[in-house]
């Protein structure tokens, strides 16, 4: 099976190999058949799993990295505190994370990396939704959602963040 990827490249989708009884003999693998005779089994090998991962990467990506469907993304929403050293930012980000974790796979990145580095890192990893929150957002009662697919930013009220994240994730296939 060799499905064609969107860029015209064929990907070997699955393989099967018939090994006969050679490996069974070499490793002393035996069984007793219905007539009570000792036999060596005939063996086969089948492969698909790692090729499936390759197909996802080839199909769901662009020049900036992966674009993972929410169903397979290990992280569905990354929360990036902007100016996290400012009072209240990490606390608000943590509260949003706790709310979203009830229904989504969420990561709150409170590392010391720069905000730009974090944006790039999670875009490359294919995280479907990025949530940005900083002091000005908190003051206004909002946060910013960014879609990995469209790269569009949407300012949403913190009170509606769970519904807005759900709607954004549904737009990604």
Predicted regions and their residues:
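NTP/phosphate- and nucleic-acid-binding module
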Residues: 1-173
């Amino acid at each position: 099976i060799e499905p064609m990827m969107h860029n015209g490249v064929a990907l070997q989708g699955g393989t099967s190999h018939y090994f006969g009884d050679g490996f069974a003999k070499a490793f002393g693998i035996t069984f007793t058949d219905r007539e009570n005779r000792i036999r060596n089994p005939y063996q086969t090998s089948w492969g698909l799993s790692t090729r499936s991962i390759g197909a996802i990467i080839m199909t769901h990506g662009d020049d900036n990295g992966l674009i993972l469907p929410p169903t397979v993304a290990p992280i569905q929403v990354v929360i990036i505190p902007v100016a996290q050293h400012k009072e209240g930012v990490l606390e608000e980000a943590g509260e949003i994370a706790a709310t979203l974790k009830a229904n989504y796979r969420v990561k709150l990145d409170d590392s010391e990396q720069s905000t730009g580095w974090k944006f790039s890192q999670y875009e490359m990893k294919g995280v479907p939704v990025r949530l940005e929150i900083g002091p000005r957002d908190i003051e206004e009662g909002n946060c910013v959602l960014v879609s990995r697919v469209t790269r569009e930013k949407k300012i949403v009220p913190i009170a509606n963040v769970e519904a807005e994240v759900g709607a954004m994730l549904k737009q990604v296939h």
